[in-house]
Amino acid sequence: MATGVLPAPVSGIKIPDSKVGFGKSMNLVRICDVRSLRSARRRVSVIRNSNQGSDLAELQPASEGSPLLVPRQKYCESLHKTVRRKTRTVMVGNVALGSEHPIRIQTMTTSDTKDITGTVDEVMRIADKGADIVRITVQGKKEADACFEIKDKLVQLNYNIPLVADIHFAPTVALRVAECFDKIRVNPGNFADRRAQFETIDYTEDEYQKELQHIEQVFTPLVEKCKKYGRAMRIGTNHGSLSDRIMSYYGDSPRGMVESAFEFARICRKLDYHNFVFSMKASNPVIMVQAYRLLVAEMYVHGWDYPLHLGVTEAGEGEDGRMKSAIGIGTLLQDGLGDTIRVSLTEPPEEEIDPCRRLANLGTKAAKLQQGVAPFEEKHRHYFDFQRRTGDLPVQKEGEEVDYRNVLHRDGSVLMSISLDQLKAPELLYRSLATKLVVGMPFKDLATVDSILLRELPPVDDQVARLALKRLIDVSMGVIAPLSEQLTKPLPNAMVLVNLKELSGGAYKLLPEGTRLVVSLRGDEPYEELEILKNIDATMILHDVPFTEDKVSRVHAARRLFEFLSENSVNFPVIHHINFPTGIHRDELVIHAGTYAGGLLVDGLGDGVMLEAPDQDFDFLRNTSFNLLQGCRMRNTKTEYVSCPSCGRTLFDLQEISAEIREKTSHLPGVSIAIMGCIVNGPGEMADADFGYVGGSPGKIDLYVGKTVVKRGIAMTEATDALIGLIKEHGRWVDPPVADE
């Protein structure tokens, strides 16, 4: 072991051989617990913020687990408001991409590229929906030849939308199609490297350098051709398709994703080619956000200004896909990051355009208004890795008549607002809250709402409504009522909602001693108003910035609040409360919730959500809340799916098969299933799925357990049942629940 202190400031720090650089004029405060590594090359998994102070971060060697404290890296223009990151302009055909231009919207065709007419028709439908750019898969020479005809036909029909070739394992195909398409997407994990076998390989320094020389030899001709023809390029890393070489040194990590892309970017820069963008995609929004932030932090260090293409890969379909995409893309847009976006849905590609546009509009508005809060010092947020700030869950107090320990859930809570009308039919209310009914009595289940808010309490003589609430309280469901209601129509054992004014004015002291408090606040209040939180006992905080607020950013106000709480060791759980206006579109609601609440939960900031919308279906709001928690890798209440959006490589009707599998397996919380049209990027694309259903050849399916294929060539008509059999084989199956009578 070694500890020590280096002089500060230290200029131009660079950790030897790790490819992790740090900018000039930064202070290296101290180095501790540095162990000698087996290799000359330091293995690095992730940069992590330290709790030691605002100017520190931890650099974690992958195998030894010893923190190296280094200066905290900048990853966005501002920590207290949305300011769009300045980038160079990259030309993709006739479309300019970068910070001086609108956030560009794009998608990808699903037709067989060799079907020229079908592909042309699909591109036109996409363009008519408003996309700026379209990507087409090009897997071989026949597809590359077809691309020339596709481009010609579109031009003849006055469709000049830029076309992007999606390339995997095919450098020669990339060279061919660069002569007609406007942009080439290369995957650093498989452009020059073989498909990952998930083997840990020990390289000497010379062996590693030879691998890099091989990449340069294979990649250079494409760079030179793109320069010659004025083509753009996307260096697009996928978390699931990192090479064995990268994973051996950096782990299956955001750090490895960044280094994989930088290897290719260094070659581009060496050849004086700069018309390229980066992407860091993953199916897990938490990993995706970390990777993009780390990428940008490294670009700041090097003085690079290349634009970003944002996307969550294999997001799925319907609300799930929109939610995952909003959590990942929306979070980064609030940080001012992102110049073009794609929402990857297992739906027709033109259906991706509307949610794409909604996300782009959110990001554009936030940056234009520079939504935020007054500057504040941020010391405690972990934005290069996930470390959840866990609020103290309620504990039972002496003399309490009911059990409050389950009014919040340790993995993330869902709160709902209910009306007096709903109390008129108690059994329907119990079902709406997803309780399990036994002889008409409610009991909490896996996906039951944890607590409810009533803005108006029933009259004291309304025995039906009050009995319904008592039964909910008796099974540890929290019932929250405003202070004024509880003082005039007291409900035994209710929790009481108070604001900061009611706290500072002492009105809450009119309540019986021991009453549980729920505090509602915005997060941008003067610190002297927040000071009262240090002197009270609250069961939870509801963080609520009005939806119509234009100048204050919900995300930045919450970050400021969490900073105050952490700095003062106030550990109340915080629930993100969003009250949507009447008439909001469902997709808009999902995307806002994913952006504004998900953007905090992926940083480990928050203990649950409460979504309100006066004219939206109650079940929809409840399901959306649970989907949000699951999308942020918090509380699992249903089967998790990793489902690719389909492309020209897909070997079956992905939408139809996906629906069939979901119908039969959606009741398996804690189980994750990958549904992949092909395995072009290798089994790593299935992320951390427990089981995989993958197109192996036309009409045939391969089944996976983890990243290992266990059954090959199953007829498609039998494959879904075979998947269920595999789940049963591994002890992960339960029969679907029987509906309550």
From Swiss-Prot:
What catalytic reaction does the record list? (2E)-4-hydroxy-3-methylbut-2-enyl diphosphate + 2 oxidized [2Fe-2S]-[ferredoxin] + H2O = 2-C-methyl-D-erythritol 2,4-cyclic diphosphate + 2 reduced [2Fe-2S]-[ferredoxin] + H(+)
Record family assignment: Belongs to the IspG family.
Q: Which InterPro entries match?
A: Dihydropteroate_synth-like_sf, IspG_atypical, IspG_bac-typ, NO2/SO3_Rdtase_4Fe4S_sf
Q: Which GO terms describe its molecular function?
A: 4 iron, 4 sulfur cluster binding; 4-hydroxy-3-methylbut-2-en-1-yl diphosphate synthase activity (ferredoxin); iron ion binding
Look up the domain of life of the source. Answer: Eukaryota
According to its UniProt entry, one GO biological process term is:
isopentenyl diphosphate biosynthetic process, methylerythritol 4-phosphate pathway
Q: Which UniProt keywords apply?
A: 4Fe-4S, Chloroplast, Iron, Iron-sulfur, Isoprene biosynthesis, Metal-binding, Oxidoreductase, Plastid, Transit peptide
What is its quaternary makeup?
A: Homodimer.
Give the induction text. Circadian-regulated with a peak in the late period of dark phase and early period of the light phase.
What EC number(s) is this enzyme filed under?
A: 1.17.7.1
Residues that coordinate or bind [4Fe-4S] cluster: 644, 647, 678, 685
Residue stretch of the organelle transit peptide: 1-38
Task: Tell me where it resides.
Answer: Plastid, Chloroplast stroma
Q: How is the cofactor bound?
A: Binds 1 [4Fe-4S] cluster per subunit.
Identify the pathway. Answer: Isoprenoid biosynthesis; isopentenyl diphosphate biosynthesis via DXP pathway; isopentenyl diphosphate from 1-deoxy-D-xylulose 5-phosphate: step 5/6
HAMAP family per the record?
A: IspG (MF_00159)
Q: What is this protein called?
A: 4-hydroxy-3-methylbut-2-en-1-yl diphosphate synthase (ferredoxin), chloroplastic
- UniProt note on tissues of expression: Expressed in roots, shoots, leaves, flowers and siliques (at protein level).
Gene field? ISPG
Q: Which cofactor does it need?
A: [4Fe-4S] cluster
Using the record, list the residue span of the signal peptide; answer none if the entry has no such feature. Answer: none
What is one term from the GO cellular component aspect held by the record?
plastid
- The UniProt entry lists the main location of this chain as plastid
